[in-house]
């Protein structure tokens, strides 16, 4: 059986941990391995941080939207903003590429997402926003939604 959740919150950096913990609690019903849980929570942090820092340029009046679903041991996650958008998604997905070189850890967000998830798709349009679609097949699943 499929299970889903939706979450939206202000694009403020302190909400990144809220998003990470909430998604972690949602996938806990799948009984993921510690590595899977850590990877998913890290990906949430990276995508939400990208939305806040790059999408909304740190302006707290934006909203970050998360949709998560689980079905048959497959976890799907969508993180969306209505911010600045990305003019060249392929360039932005290159390791160490950043539009904010002054920030530490810059340029690894998409690389981390690609390494931790089975599928990553980025759809973006300048001045419209960005949506990141992520999918992970969990190795150990005792989910109530199986």
From Swiss-Prot:
Its EC number is 2.7.11.1. It catalyses: L-seryl-[protein] + ATP = O-phospho-L-seryl-[protein] + ADP + H(+); L-threonyl-[protein] + ATP = O-phospho-L-threonyl-[protein] + ADP + H(+). It comes from the Bacteria. It holds the Pfam family HATPase_c_2. GO terms for biological process: asexual sporulation; negative regulation of sporulation resulting in formation of a cellular spore; sporulation resulting in formation of a cellular spore. Keywords: ATP-binding, Kinase, Nucleotide-binding, Serine/threonine-protein kinase, Sporulation, Transferase. One of its GO terms (molecular function) is protein serine kinase activity. InterPro entries: Anti-sigma-factor_SerPK (IPR050267), Anti-sigma_F (IPR010194), HATPase_C_sf (IPR036890). Belongs to the anti-sigma-factor family. Binds to sigma F and blocks its ability to form an RNA polymerase holoenzyme (E-sigma F). Phosphorylates SpoIIAA on a serine residue. This phosphorylation may enable SpoIIAA to act as an anti-anti-sigma factor that counteracts SpoIIAB and thus releases sigma F from inhibition. This is Anti-sigma F factor.
């Amino acid at each position: 059986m499929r299970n889903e959740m939706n979450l939206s919150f202000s694009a403020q950096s302190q909400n990144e941990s809220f998003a990470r913990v909430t998604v972690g609690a949602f996938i806990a019903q799948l009984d993921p391995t510690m590595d899977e849980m850590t990877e998913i929570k890290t990906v949430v942090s990276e995508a939400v941080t990208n939305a806040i820092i790059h999408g909304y340029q740190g302006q707290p009046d934006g909203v970050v939207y998360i949709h998560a679903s689980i079905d048959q041991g497959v976890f799907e996650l969508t993180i969306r903003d209505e911010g600045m958008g990305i003019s060249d998604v392929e360039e932005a997905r290159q390791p160490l590429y950043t539009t904010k070189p002054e920030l530490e850890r810059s340029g690894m967000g998409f690389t981390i997402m690609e390494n931790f998830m089975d599928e990553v798709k980025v759809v973006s349009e300048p001045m419209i926003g960005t949506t990141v679609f992520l999918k992970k097949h969990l190795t150990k699943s005792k989910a109530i939604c199986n």
